[in-house]
């Protein structure tokens, strides 16, 4: 008599095993290869100018909404974007908003911004703060035009599920391809265009999740009385809104002090003690004297430098990377680094950008190895 056969169900893979394998394959192998291959210096001449819907710009470090690996092929940086924008005399940018806050440093020229209907004038050397979800647009002075250095944590916002924004007005110089037709949502907002071949191209800031809910946050009112721990969270809802509506939008960096530190001569221009409303970034200017060097240190958080003046090189984990004016230097996580001025006659000036995200999760300290040259 034939025995009855039973098929035993195979056990489900353990979540730990699956996640470990995914982590090893994606982060330890693929991402590691990309990070090792990515350039630490993005040279000005190697980055193309592009006329986009908001401005004419170069993307040194930037998010790619559909492909994180493309981001990492540009530069070994996850949390900081960096773009250089030009506004010709009398021209304006596009008009839009987004959930990630933004920071602009004015390299050349002067002009003004309109943020949520209010005007803010700026000039070379100023730092401009754009709070989360602020509707903003840049206008260049008719005599000078303007060159702006821009950063926004777009990649971080995408990861948190609040990427995107709303495009209210295109830059006057932006042109859709010949024969393309605009695409709009039910409210009439421009979301992209359809090419002659039928392919639809979304605009970078279209398709915002739960926009009405986010806008409502800006109308929050304070509690009359805080009685419980839960009430403190309700009050925080108002405090976040109040900060964004009352913060400093233009920092006059010429009025801020230089500090002679172990790392060198530094001027902090975006910092928790400066009430800009920026919660994502720290930003400082640093000078290196002719033939001198910065201190040598290491920190968990990644960092990006934009060279405003001068020429020199970085030593990053023992490897030399040369740079010059208008180049971007990318310092990945946990990289031991030091900057050197190779010009015996002229000083170096650079702008440093870092995210405070690492501070919030307990990795904001600096391991200092060597003082700057005197």
Regions found by a protein language model. Name each.
Residues 76, 123, 132-159, 163, ...:
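Ligand-binding loop in jelly-roll beta-barrel domains
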Residues 2-78, 175-279, 365-374:
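A short, N-terminal "cap"/entry segment at the start of jelly-roll beta-barrel domains
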Residues 80-87, 103-107, 122, 127-130, ...:
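Short, structured motif recognition centered on aromatic/hydrophobic residues
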Residues 155-179, 363-370:
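A hydrophobic/aromatic-rich effector-binding and dimerization subdomain
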Residues 64-68, 82-97, 265-271, 282-299, ...:
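Conserved short histidine dyad/triad with adjacent acidic residue
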Residues 119, 127, 167-174, 320, ...:
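Short amphipathic alpha-helical linker/capping segments at the junctions of internal repeats
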Residues 92-124, 134, 293, 297-325, ...:
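A short beta-strand-loop-beta hairpin characteristic of the jelly-roll/cupin
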Residues 115, 160-161, 316, 362:
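Intrinsically disordered, low-complexity regions enriched in proline, serine, glycine
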